[in-house]
Amino acid sequence: MVFIEVQLPHGTGIAELPQPSSSVCLIPVNPDDHVLMNGLTSWVQDVILSFEDSAGKPVLLFDEKRVDAIVLELLSRAIPGMRFFPYPSENLAGGNLMPVTDAEQPFLLAGADIASGFAERGFPDDTIVIGLRQLFGITTILWPGSSVFSGALNNKQPLFHIDLYLCPLGRLACAPEFQHILVAELTPETCLQGWSAQAAQLAQALNQTAVWLESAPEGIAFKVIRVPLFVFDSELRHIGSCANAVAENINGCCRVFLPDYTPPNPLPAVEHNLKKAIRSIQQRTEIVLLNAGIQEVLFIDGNYFTLSEREGALHCHSKVIARSA
């Protein structure tokens, strides 16, 4: 059985799905359709964050305000040995935290806004670092993100979520000496309603993050793979990032699931041209990822064009917590 935790808008009217009091429910998926689905996968999402500790034991952090107790009860029965902990602070959320524990040097990607959020409440930097190290059992913490990102990409959330533009892939068989990572890239081609000074500023900030990761921060050798960040309006409020993805990497065999941002049908002529442009860019992205050593690239059709109006995409709306054959 494969448990996928899904965050649904209220009033979706999907009768076949359980409707708990919060927006979180569990859906069983047939693993026979997914050859590589086995072992724990560390996928990050806002309300739940699952990862393996340094001893290889499964841990799950959750938001007490948004996850029903029945969800935790089901998971505790389905995944023996998993430990459950509530997020110790409202300034922490899955979208801000990406633990990578299967590396020779385990590390935690933590959004820079976490530090600034705690600092505004009077917590010194060393207290924040110590707390995160204790929570995750990881010594090395990297702090991506900036106020530029927070303003342009995170207008509906109190803290900037780095899963909007980063997706760790782990080590690939073609280049095992690197930690591969997707980083979003904004270009005039992907800014579909015209280039602007604000778009250029955001593109520069994303490029700076890519360069920073390639500089081997804390001695970690990253190999950056750039993927498109779409801007669908002139105000940079409707954004779809191909880095808001999920990756399955088992023994160096990696496949990546990306949100399909092509608009739904039926479409007027102007949206039809938009759909063609998005599809063309996504097809080229698939080739880039395959050439980088990823075995399979899957664009998932989930009406993400519409969902991205509410800052949501594949990484924010689904999570595989554990798999069994």
Give the positions of each predicted feature.
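Histidine/cysteine-enriched polar flanking segments
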Residues: 1-325
